[in-house]
Amino acid sequence: ANIELSLVVDTTAPVVKNIASSGQIVRGGSAVVAVQAKDMALDNVYISNGTDNFKLFSYLNNDIYVGIIAWPLKNKFFSAQVVAKDKAGNITKYNLPIARNINAPYYRSNIAIKEDFLNGKLNELLAQINQKHLKPFENNVERFVFFNETIRQEDESRILKACSDLNSNISFAEDFHAFMPLKGSKVVGNFGDYRTYFLNKEKISEAVHLGIDVASVKNAPIIASNKGVVLLKSHLGLYGNTLLLYHGFGVSSIYSHMQESYVQVSDEVSVGQELGKTGQTG
């Protein structure tokens, strides 16, 4: 028997066009991207910084995609490239003209660790960590390095996983506001601060601060600046009681060192809603 089939052989790659994007990006910062991607059988479209891939979200119609691309401090290199692939396997790679600014001013801090901290507060913090982590330490320096480096990395991995596990295309960002979680607060610690720790004038550890420390008064209310959904509620070793909120288009916010929180994972929050309270130090 003879079988006749009509087939469409697709050898045409998707067409990608830049609609709008941030003019430049600083190392440690982010940029907004909007592109048009057209194809009769488009399968996937995303943006890469040369190391990491970021999701692009359908906006207004099926041809327009928007999203946020980051240049993490850990990455020395940055190159913005949109990748579009159709169901036939045709791929288009489109480079975006985002200028790189490597001159962002990040602080360097030298922090003296005191024996009182190693014998007091550090013991309290280590006691809150899952017992499977704990092992015999030769001295206080080993204990501090374990907490400052190993536990820090595990915390950051948990936060990244919570963000990456999100499958929802829901956007809450119709009217996006600057983040101001504490009224009447002031910044006491900067993002990207490179911290070197010393004990008796000897360097024992180092770390990059990946948050912004804002201080107010004891047990101050922590307010949601934007609508969102709770992705993570957990006690993390270095971050303490922590909430992670997702706001749409790949943007999340994290709140750490909380005394208490009033929301649960999957809860939707509204602008102005009280998320919880700060701790003893504000």
Enumerate the language-model features and the residues they cover.
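Long, compositionally biased, intrinsically disordered segments
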Residues: 1-4, 27
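Proline/serine/threonine-rich low-complexity linkers at boundaries of modular beta-sandwich domains
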Residues: 3-15
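Proline-enriched interdomain boundary motifs that mark the N-terminal boundary
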Residues: 13-19, 222
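Short beta-strand segments of immunoglobulin-like
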Residues: 19-26
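Outer-membrane beta-barrel proteins
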Residues: 23, 70-72, 202
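Non-catalytic extracellular/periplasmic "stalk"
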Residues: 30-32, 43-190, 198
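Extracellular acidic, Ser/Thr/Pro-rich low-complexity tracts
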Residues: 37-41
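Catalytic cores of peptidoglycan-degrading enzymes
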Residues: 177-282
